[in-house]
Structure formats: C-alpha cells, structure tokens
Amino acid sequence: MTQAFTVVIPARYASTRLPGKPLQDIAGQPMIQRVWNQARKSAASRVVVATDDERILAACQGFGAEALLTRAEHNSGTDRLEEVASRLGLASDAIVVNVQGDEPLIPPALIDQVAANLAAHPEAAIATLAEPIHEVSALFNPNVVKVATDIDGLALTFSRAPLPWARDAFARDRDSLPEGVPYRRHIGIYAYRVGFLADFVAWGPCWLENAESLEQLRALWHGVRIHVADARETMLPGVDTPEDLERVRRVLGG
C-alpha cells in the first residue's frame, strides 16, 4: 500500500519578473488554480495552497481550494512549508510534497513518483527528480540546475555550474556534450519527511546554499540524504517570465 501524502503549493504574489504571477489568467483560470487542478489529479490525500497574500487566499477560496495564509518573512519555500506542516499538525513521519505554484503543466504522475520514492527510501529525508541534459547550452546555463548522484541514487551535490566539469573534453571542445558523462538537470519538485523540516529551518542558510542560491544544499551540508530519480514523464518548463506565461497560455488555450 502506498503511503499517504500531502501536497503543499507555495504561492507568493511578489515576483521580480512577473508580479502577481499566481493570479495571472491562463485560459480562463488563474495560474494557481491550474497548479491546484494538476495536484488534485495525483494520489495526494490533501492539497493545500500556502500563500502570504490575501488576494491569492481569496482566489483560492473562490475556486474551492484549501489555503493557508502564512507569514511573509520566510527565507525559502521550505521554511514556508515547515510552517504549513506544523499548522496542519502533520506527523513527523508523514510525507509532504512541495509543488511550485508556477508549474501549471506539472504531470500528476511526477507528484506521485517523488512521494513514492521517498516512502521507498527510508535512508533519505528528501526525494526529488531529474532528467538527462541533451544540449550543451543547457549545461552552461546557470538557470538549469545540475545534479550528480552516487551509485545508490543519492545526491552528491547540485550546482548551477556544469557538473561535473569534464576537464579534458572541455579543453578540446565546449560546443558539444562530452561522451560518457550522464549530465542531468534537476527538476524542482521535492518530497520531504515532515520531521526533517523543523531541523532544516533551525539550521539556517549555509554559505554554499547562499553562493549557489540553492536551498537543497543546506540539507547536504548537514549530511541529510536526498534521493534523486529520473522523472518518468517530461517536466515542461514553469512560468518565470511574461514569455513563459504566453507559451503556457498557448498550450492550455488550445
């Protein structure tokens, strides 16, 4: 029997490149409703939107979503997740999946996959997903987060830089991917054991996390194991810019 899990969708109004992003209309529905709809298609026993904005809260209540108004001063999405897990009274061994509020095209199967992976790997406190990198431009793009794992699928590290650096191959040619190096792009969906979240918040950011602007490095810094599996379905890009928004509108608007 698959372990039950809760989905939490953090949704902030403030966005440098796309203010009010969760409320942007996509084919007649606000983006946050699109994300919520996808999450509800998963096997989650509960789907909760976590927001720091009254406008988003009102919109969620309007279309029937369970939503919580959280504190505004959280340092990261995981810190916000810990507040929600605490307020919901989730048990320490419960699993919670963090689905980003700007992923209206997220496949429900990936939500189920990451939750099941964590349940199947008791040595890990976090599970996440990745997919192969096929283009050298993605490898050198700092907005594409790379991940390297050990033989058991546990993360060694994450970086915005090319990871690993193929010294000899790149000395000859940086216009193509080196042969024999399985480069992988991290997909930003996480499953957590609730008991881990309080530790994560109490630790505070580390210098490596700050340098890369990758909060999962805080967990690795403290020796926490992160299980990484290849995604079973393609994860289409989320919405970060007005151009992304128009692309998704075209996809969902038919």
UniProtKB/Swiss-Prot annotation:
Keywords: Cytoplasm, Lipopolysaccharide biosynthesis, Nucleotidyltransferase, Transferase. One of its GO terms (molecular function) is 3-deoxy-manno-octulosonate cytidylyltransferase activity. GO terms for biological process: CMP-keto-3-deoxy-D-manno-octulosonic acid biosynthetic process; lipopolysaccharide biosynthetic process. It is found in: Cytoplasm. Pfam families: CTP_transf_3 (PF02348). GO terms for cellular component: cytosol. Pathway: Nucleotide-sugar biosynthesis; CMP-3-deoxy-D-manno-octulosonate biosynthesis; CMP-3-deoxy-D-manno-octulosonate from 3-deoxy-D-manno-octulosonate and CTP: step 1/1; Bacterial outer membrane biogenesis; lipopolysaccharide biosynthesis. It comes from the Bacteria. Its EC number is 2.7.7.38. It is an enzyme of class 2 (transferase). It catalyses: 3-deoxy-alpha-D-manno-oct-2-ulosonate + CTP = CMP-3-deoxy-beta-D-manno-octulosonate + diphosphate. Activates KDO (a required 8-carbon sugar) for incorporation into bacterial lipopolysaccharide in Gram-negative bacteria. Belongs to the KdsB family. HAMAP family: KdsB. This is 3-deoxy-manno-octulosonate cytidylyltransferase. It comes from Pseudomonas aeruginosa (strain LESB58).
